[in-house]
Amino acid sequence: MREPESRPRLRFDRNELAGAFGDIGTDLPLIIGMIAASGLNSASVLVMFGLMQFLTAFAYGMPMAVQPLKAVAVIVITQHIAPGVLYGGGFSIGVAMLILTITGGIDWLGRVVPRAVVRGLQLGLGLQLSLLALGNYVQRDGASGYVLAAVSFVIIIALLGNRRFPPALFVIALGVVYAIVLKMNVSDIAGSVGFSLPHVQRLSLSEITSGFVLLAIPQIPLSLGNSILATRQIAEDLFPEKRIGVRKLSLTYAAMNLINPWFGGIPTCHGSGGLVGQYTFGARTGGSLIIYGSLFLTLGIFFATGFQHVVQVFPLPVLGVLLLFEGVGLMQLIRGETGNRYEFFIVLVVGLLANGLSYGYAIALVVGTVLYYLCLLYTSPSPRD
């Protein structure tokens, strides 16, 4: 339904408040996982994530949610990427997206990279995340860990798909209570409040280069599909009067990732799921993003020390169950490719290469694309037919 054109760009009421947290169940597990895996500074991550919500609130005047880049998050969590390489990767993603947008290369990339290859990369990410969750995280903490994992699993199954009561929030709350009660002492809790600001970072050429190969190459094709094209379509469906174009989405995507690395922020993007999540619960303006961003700003500026302590002692079995469902969700995206045996074969090859090799995502992208066009050539009817 078309919304009234007189609607303000920013509004603060109970609907905006209700919609503000429509995607927190997806964001928090990835943020916690990245901080834990790479030892990131909590204040920097939280404050910059909050500020990016503000940026898009003012740029769009609608609930254009900001999310962690999923491919980057999965690779960082599973491979324990160093902070400098993460920042270099985020910066290289910003530069690449800016160049692709200005030159029109983003349209070319969308035509050249087959959907089967993108699905294969998602399969590889899902496999890697699920194997890490089951092999490294769920098995930690002995018997108590298995109990926590089982309870978390039951909660998620019971509430799966429930947007009003996102299961991840209840599972995260369980993990936080467990960490505070059983893993933190009085001095940790007493020192959890303080004033913190983001740390300024320096980026080296080697970090930018490594980040480009490890993180940017697998992320950009996925971003093209979910962060740009899918988000533009959903924005057009929900807010047709806004006339949001691919170019503007690409530019704000690039801007976020050109800013974030210098202040210790994680790479971020626009997410079609985040937009739908906030809209579903009532958000109609950028006010929901101001509310959502304020939560992260408050946590980062005043409670970063406490947040860091909680992340350090957060029960890995609980995090493992959350990441397992993230991985399964990524793998489910290949269902639409099962109708064509050649494309399904490419999906499997790309997924296995991405998961099994060093620099696997870059190799899988190239091999999968070449394989796709060879299959296309092989299956095309000859002129004599």
Regions found by a protein language model. Give the residues of each.
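Conserved small/polar residues in nucleotide/adenosyl-binding loops
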Residues: 378-385
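Loop-to-transmembrane alpha-helix initiation sites
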Residues: 142-147, 167-169, 313-320, 343, ...
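Membrane-embedded helical hairpins/re-entrant loop segments and their flanking transmembrane helices
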Residues: 2-17, 33-55, 215-286
